[in-house]
């Protein structure tokens, strides 16, 4: 298919990894950081903070708080898997699932709401910085600028779908 010999595989793999740099291992590091945050009790701290913002029993504000927090924390962490454990424990369970929402639907939509944040942050190097590096773009954030409006629309759609179908 490529008309290259198999001996080119190590050379080309090395070249691409060197071009991408340290961003290659960033997703794994961020995933590990998420588990450290979860073990440290960050979810409980977030739950206590959100308890003052989201009124008891308000499903809409619970859904909005959960989806937006997933996106924002994913932007900070750079990885939706890292944010998922912390935000679901801190907001998803007490403010959405405990109000009668379907946990499977909340989990699926919560995780993908986090991916809306992935599209809007340089911390998600594997999605945003690596493509800019490979394409040798002048502005390393160009990919993010293009993706941000779509990500915001998708986040709003996630909120609507979760509110309408999870309960």
Identify the meaning behind each predicted range.
Residues 31-38, 74, 78, 112-120, ...:
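Helix-loop-helix module between adjacent transmembrane segments
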Residues 41-60:
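Membrane-interface interhelical connector segments
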Residues 115-167:
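Juxtamembrane and boundary regions of transmembrane helices in multi-pass small-molecule transporters
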Residues 7-42:
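Core transmembrane alpha-helical segments of multi-pass membrane transporters/permeases
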Residues 54-94:
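Hydrophobic alpha-helical transmembrane segments of multi-pass integral membrane proteins
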Residues 60-73, 99-120:
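Alpha-helical transmembrane segments of multi-pass membrane proteins
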Residues 2-9, 36-47, 75-81, 161-167:
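Transmembrane helix-loop junctions in multi-pass membrane proteins
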Residues 1, 31, 66-74, 151-165:
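Hydrophobic core segments of alpha-helical transmembrane domains in multi-pass membrane transport
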């Amino acid at each position: 298919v490529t008309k290259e010999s198999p001996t080119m595989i190590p050379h080309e793999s090395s070249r691409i990894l060197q071009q991408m740099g340290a961003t290659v291992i960033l997703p794994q590091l961020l995933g590990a950081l998420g588990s450290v945050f979860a073990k440290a009790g960050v979810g409980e701290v977030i739950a206590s903070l959100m308890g003052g913002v989201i009124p008891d029993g308000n499903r809409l504000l619970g859904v909005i708080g959960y989806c937006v927090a997933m996106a924002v924390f994913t932007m900070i962490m750079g990885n939706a898997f890292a944010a998922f454990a912390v935000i679901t424990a801190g907001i998803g369970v007490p403010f959405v699932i405990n109000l009668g929402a379907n946990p499977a639907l909340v989990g699926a939509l919560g995780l993908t709401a986090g991916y809306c944040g992935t599209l809007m942050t340089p911390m998600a190097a594997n999605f945003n910085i690596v493509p800019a590096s490979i394409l040798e773009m002048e502005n390393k954030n160009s990919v993010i600028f293009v993706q941000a409006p779509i990500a915001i629309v998708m986040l709003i759609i996630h909120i609507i779908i979760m509110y309408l179908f999870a309960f």
